[in-house]
Amino acid sequence: MDQKMINDLKEQVFQTNLLLPKYGLVIHTWGNVSMIAPNRQFFVIKPSGVSYDKMRAQDMVVVDLDNNVLDTNGLKPSSDTPTHALMYKHCPDIKAIVHTHSTFATSFAQADKPIPCLGTTHADNFFGPIPCTRALSDSEINGAYEHNTGLVILEHLKNNQVDVNACAAILVKEHGSFVWSNKNGKDAVDRALTLEQVAQMALYTQMINPHMKEANPALQQKHYNRKHGKDAYYGQDTKQED
């Protein structure tokens, strides 16, 4: 392995993990961010149970897609590592994953409810509702729990033909959210922050009007496509004249 590449990736993952408490997405030692190497042979993830204010870049743990620890500073990787590994193995577009127990998104997960698309804020960022997986069975919980968490995520994505680039988030029933990016860790955290915001908006909207239906499908399609479609026109061109 290229040690410079590993060190650079550790620094990126470290800095990105620090955004979770900064943005109010986690408390204590909850949550984690990982990023996969360009060759997709290994990924770097936050260590298990280490507080954010004591964590260092060199504490990030390097793991392969079969959960073998390749490089560590004497610390165990996040307990959610098998979930991340399975998603990287089966979703080649995913380059970074964020897992949190943020308040509003997790409330929907605990209620076994998808987050409906009720307006343009949601549609600008996620295509369609944010789905919620089925519950894990007792045998899945008592077996390889974190691996099985990954399996129920993949099961839902496959069975419902979810485009992981268009809807880059999922709720795991009774657990929390997993959010990902086809770009980098910072983008994945931004999406996790957006997920929390649209979950809060959805809850408040349903409190005001319990009978509120999802936003007009044409409006959803328009707002998603203008930012992410092949003819997207939101924002500035990459190259601009001086």
UniProtKB/Swiss-Prot annotation:
One GO CC annotation: cytosol
Lineage of producing organism: Bacteria, Bacillati, Mycoplasmatota, Mycoplasmoidales, Mycoplasmoidaceae
Name of this protein: Probable L-ribulose-5-phosphate 4-epimerase UlaF
Gene encoding the protein: ulaF
Pfam families: Aldolase_II
Function according to Swiss-Prot or TrEMBL: Catalyzes the isomerization of L-ribulose 5-phosphate to D-xylulose 5-phosphate. Is involved in the anaerobic L-ascorbate utilization.
Species name: Mycoplasma pneumoniae (strain ATCC 29342 / M129 / Subtype 1)
Pathway: Cofactor degradation; L-ascorbate degradation; D-xylulose 5-phosphate from L-ascorbate: step 4/4
EC numbers for this chain: 5.1.3.4
EC class: isomerase
Annotated substrate binding sites: 31-32, 48-49, 78-79
GO molecular function: aldehyde-lyase activity; L-ribulose-phosphate 4-epimerase activity; zinc ion binding
Matching InterPro entries: Aldolase_class_II_sugar_metab (IPR050197), Aldolase_II/adducin_N (IPR001303), Aldolase_II/adducin_N_sf (IPR036409)
Catalytic activity: L-ribulose 5-phosphate = D-xylulose 5-phosphate
